[in-house]
Design a protein with these regions (language model features):
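Glycan-recognition surfaces in beta-rich domains, encompassing non-catalytic CBMs
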Residues: 1-129
Length: 129
């Protein structure tokens, strides 16, 4: 069986991303595609993709928290804190997945780095390999 591998940038506004909770939209030229979603309460963003790897593109800053990222039932915690603002950052990257269909879920945890002033998480885009 063979699979078509996607090589693309999936923007936060893509209808194939399933959102729960109250995500808000920040509009700016500093974001990939001109927008970035953010949330600071219970919420998830889920996307099914075909490929062997994925990157989470997000905004990092001094008021961001820790996101829970789940890929095919494996859990990773991603700290979006940065002392200075960093837009379009590769916040998380995973390669070496078996060729096929996978699911990524990004979830607000309420957790934060001790240096952070807040616990919001962001989603700017996914990059599929």
């Amino acid at each position: 069986m063979s699979y078509k591998v996607e090589e693309s940038l999936i923007q936060d506004s893509n209808a194939a991303i399933s959102y729960t909770g109250t995500w808000k939209v920040a509009t700016s030229t500093k974001h990939s595609g001109g927008t970035c979603k953010y949330v600071s309460s219970a919420a998830t963003a889920t996307y099914k993709f075909t490929g062997t790897g994925i990157k989470l593109i997000a905004s990092k800053s001094s008021d961001k928290g820790i996101a829970k990222v789940t890929i095919d039932s494996k859990v990773y915690y991603v700290d979006l804190y940065s002392a200075s603002a960093k837009d379009q950052s590769v916040a998380f990257s995973l390669s070496g997945l078996t060729s096929g269909t996978h699911t990524i879920k990004v979830e607000w945890t309420g957790l934060k780095n001790n240096s952070s002033k807040g616990n919001a998480i962001t989603l700017d885009a996914f990059e599929i390999n």
